[in-house]
Swiss-Prot record:
Annotated family: Belongs to the UPF0761 family.
Transmembrane segments: 38-58, 68-88, 92-112, 134-154, 177-197, 207-227, 244-264
Source species: Coxiella burnetii (strain RSA 493 / Nine Mile phase I)
Stated name of the protein: UPF0761 membrane protein CBU_1578
UniProt subcellular location: Cell inner membrane
GO cellular component: plasma membrane
tRNA-binding among keywords: no
Protein's UniProt keywords contain Mitochondrion: no
Membrane topology type: Multi-pass membrane protein
Amino acid sequence: MTIYRFFKRSAFTLAYIYRRFHEEGCAYRATALAYTTLLALVPLTIVAFTLLSFVPAFQGVGVRLQNLIWENFVPTSAGMVAAYLSQLTQNVTGLSIINIFFLGIVALLLMYNINRAFVAIWHTEHHFRLSLHFLIYFMVLLLSPFLLGAVMLLGTFLVQSPLVTDLIGWPYLGKGLLFVLPYVLIFITFTLFNWVLPSAKVKLSHAVIGGLVTTVLFELAKFAFTVYLKFFPTYRVIYGALSVIPIFLVWLYVSWTIILLGAVVSNVIACGIPEKYK
């Protein structure tokens, strides 16, 4: 009887999560975020590279940070986008302050749309003016490259320390750490999404569960996406050399769908299921 009740409750929970995902229009929001991300990706990268270039200690950190993101958050099949993005960011030295300012506006709009999607899922309202929100987004955009750059430098320092070098040198422990570390990075990223972006007081435990669900689904999607493109190269046959654009756009849509689904999971765990749906 206990097992039956467990499966029954799990079925109701999954059904309600699907219902909430549909009612909040997450599929449509994922579509909008995918297009916005595609448009804002280059501006975000250029702004980050420009800010990091002002600090001599961060020379070369931008490229390493970019490679870290591409290696962990994009399937191998869509990795050609990284090469195109690297070529585009090489033109950053030829941009004026005004051009960089407008690129920053595009990046701010992406941050605003992401925040609005999480706010809609959690049914929270902003209590500040729109101008204040964009000021907050601007501060985040301004400080994030330096914080991430500092984390990269700290990580490099730790990896080169004698203790970590000895641990990595161990036959099984070293390989285990190198295998687990990318998943931990992805898990922390998605947990922070669910903890910070809803503009509400979210318990860390609820954000952790949502981050864990998102991480598992994200990794499964990466594997399935790579397998699909390998054995069913439809986009490459149709679009040829231009296939990198629709392939990457589809991956962005899948990614945002999973991220928003994780946000719904966090919200359902935090707020529970209403009696009328039980």
